[in-house]
């Protein structure tokens, strides 16, 4: 039970959150769920409560999850060798079966169950359900020694999104459900494709013209060359940071995904620290936030 001082603190926090609740009621927020937030028990529970809270105050949260470490664990237990090219898991037919078992099965249903235990009404699905996410094989190339025509590398069932059925998501959100999406797409021939979860989240946000795209990470946010978190950026500033090499390496694909979403109609993208309990609520309902905000400033003038 709260004492009087703590009760006053809670009341003050709720009062400060009210303008944000009013502003975002009825809006759609797409959250890419991954990193430590998916493995730490306290963070898993705080994330589930955050998502339920959003729904209760009138926001439409949509969760897209990863599961790379869980896939790696099962492949190891099954003695299936796994390799990566350009950061992408080479996914032959045997590996794809494991990817579907992990992403569409255990990981997806664990998230659904956790949200439901906290009072939500979550429904899990993959892109194969009702052909919800269509995909094609991702073409990966690398330079050849003579620097002529690049070599095409076959990395198996790794795909890129070609389409997202908006009607499937709106059917669920209109029924007060919380969609929980595993990043598996289906090709024209019915083949399954393993797709990067950041890319799926970005495309879903674009199709829905979402208010926000939130990418949970294991870092404090996008940092400058001095290691300081950059809290607010325009798309033009992000382009400049990519050009001068400030954004590089493993963070580059994530930032490019967020940048593309904002340039294609999403109101804002957020790179947030998923290691912080209730990170999503802090980012939405407080002035301070817990990461980097990328806004559409300048997009509409281009």
Curated annotation (Swiss-Prot):
What is the recorded name of this protein? Acetylglutamate kinase
| Ranges in a coiled coil | none
Q: Which family does it belong to?
A: Belongs to the acetylglutamate kinase family. ArgB subfamily.
- Biological processes, Gene Ontology terms: arginine biosynthetic process via ornithine; L-arginine biosynthetic process
Enumerate the UniProt keywords alphabetically. Answer: Amino-acid biosynthesis, Arginine biosynthesis, ATP-binding, Cytoplasm, Kinase, Nucleotide-binding, Transferase
Q: Which InterPro entries match?
A: AceGlu_kinase-like_sf (IPR036393), AcgluKinase_fam (IPR004662), ArgB (IPR037528), Asp/Glu/Uridylate_kinase (IPR001048), Glu/AcGlu_kinase (IPR001057), NAGK-C (IPR041727)
* Biological role stated in the UniProt entry: Catalyzes the ATP-dependent phosphorylation of N-acetyl-L-glutamate.
Supply the source organism for this entry: Hahella chejuensis (strain KCTC 2396)
List the residue(s) that the UniProt entry marks as the site Transition state stabilizer. Answer: 32, 254
Q: What is the lineage of its organism?
A: Bacteria, Pseudomonadati, Pseudomonadota, Gammaproteobacteria, Oceanospirillales
Q: Which Pfam families match?
A: AA_kinase
Give the SUPFAM superfamilies listed for this entry. Answer: Carbamate kinase-like
List where in the cell it is found. Answer: Cytoplasm
Its Enzyme Commission number(s) read 2.7.2.8
Superkingdom: Bacteria
Single Gene Ontology MF annotation: ATP binding
């Amino acid at each position: 039970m709260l004492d009087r001082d703590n009760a006053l603190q809670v009341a003050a926090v709720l009062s400060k959150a009210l303008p944000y609740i009013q502003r975002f009621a009825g809006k759609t927020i797409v959250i890419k769920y991954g990193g430590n937030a998916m493995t730490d028990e306290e963070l898993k529970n705080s994330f589930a409560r955050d998502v339920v809270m959003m729904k209760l105050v009138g926001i439409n949260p949509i969760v897209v999850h990863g599961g790379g470490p869980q896939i790696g664990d099962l492949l190891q237990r099954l003695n299936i060798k796994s390799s990566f090219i350009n950061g992408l898991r080479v996914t032959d037919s045997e590996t794809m079966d494991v990817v579907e078992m992990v992403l569409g099965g255990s990981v997806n249903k664990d998230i659904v169950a956790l949200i439901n235990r906290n009072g939500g009404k979550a429904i899990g699905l993959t892109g194969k359900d009702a052909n919800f996410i269509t995909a094609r094989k991702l073409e990966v190339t690398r330079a050849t020694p003579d620097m002529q025509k690049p070599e095409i590398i076959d990395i198996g069932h790794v795909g890129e999104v070609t389409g997202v059925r908006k009607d499937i998501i709106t059917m669920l959100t209109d029924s007060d459900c919380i969609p929980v999406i595993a990043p598996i797409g289906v090709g024209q021939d019915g083949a399954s494709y393993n797709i990067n979860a950041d890319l799926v989240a970005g495309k879903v946000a674009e199709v829905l013209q979402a208010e926000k795209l939130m990418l949970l990470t294991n870092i404090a946010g996008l940092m400058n060359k001095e290691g300081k978190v950059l809290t607010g950026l325009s798309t033009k500033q992000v382009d400049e940071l990519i050009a001068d090499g400030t954004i590089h390496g493993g963070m580059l694909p994530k930032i490019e995904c967020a940048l593309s979403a904002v340039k294609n109609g999403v109101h804002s993208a957020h790179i947030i620290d998923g290691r912080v309990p209730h990170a999503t609520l802090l980012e939405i309902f407080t002035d301070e936030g817990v990461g980097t905000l990328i806004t559409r400033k300048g997009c509409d003038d281009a």
